[in-house]
Amino acid sequence: MTKDQIKKPTFKENVDSFVTQTSKIIRFPKDVIEYIKCGHSVMQVTVGVKIKNTIRNFIGWRAVHSEHRLPSKGGIRFSSNVNQDDTEALAALMTYKCAVVNVPYGGSKGSLKINPNNYSEKELRAITKNYATKLAKKGFLNPALNVPAPDIGTSEKEMVWIMDAYRNLFPEDINYTACVTGKPV
């Protein structure tokens, strides 16, 4: 078999492999480990935004690995190098990080396939708000269930835009400011 024919494991497969190896050391039952490795849900969205008289489409994801403890917590990443597998792997890692230090959150992660440096602030605001609206309408953005934070390619600015999108959808939610962390103080 040549080097090119060898299939490299995906990021998610690597994460699952580490969990399996660890389970043997700590002697967790195999069925429990298989359940732990399964993600709860993942949503793919297409974000369409009019930019310079053309509709541009961006693919995004929000993965929820665990809802064992709520809310699920994890960043939103804007990068041209994201995909569903990586998003799910990062959500799983968030679950494990929270569990190891006994922080009462499940794990989640979001991503949008975009190079944010290629867009003006006005364009990026429209893209971010559209993405946030799609997440919120499906329950993937909610102060009690799923709370994003900044990650690669996002900052407190995007978190404010996400909070604004959530507040516009759910003006009756008095806890709307808790729908994201990483906002300016």
Q: Which stretches of residues belong to each language-model region?
A:
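Charged, low-complexity, helix/coiled-coil-prone segments
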Residues: 24-38, 65-80, 109-110, 139-149
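Generic recognition of stable, solvent-exposed alpha-helical segments in well-folded globular domains
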Residues: 14-17, 82, 86, 126, ...
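Short, Gly/Pro- and small/polar-rich lid/capping loops
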Residues: 2-46
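Glycine/serine-rich phosphate-binding loop and adjoining beta1-alpha1 elements at the start
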Residues: 79, 99-185
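Glycine-rich, N-terminal phosphate-binding loop and its surrounding beta-alpha-beta segment
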Residues: 43-118
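Amphipathic, alpha-helical segments enriched in basic
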Residues: 3, 7, 11, 24, ...
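Hydrophobic, Leu/Ile/Phe/Ala-enriched alpha-helical segments that form helix-helix packing faces
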Residues: 19-26, 91-94, 131, 135-139, ...
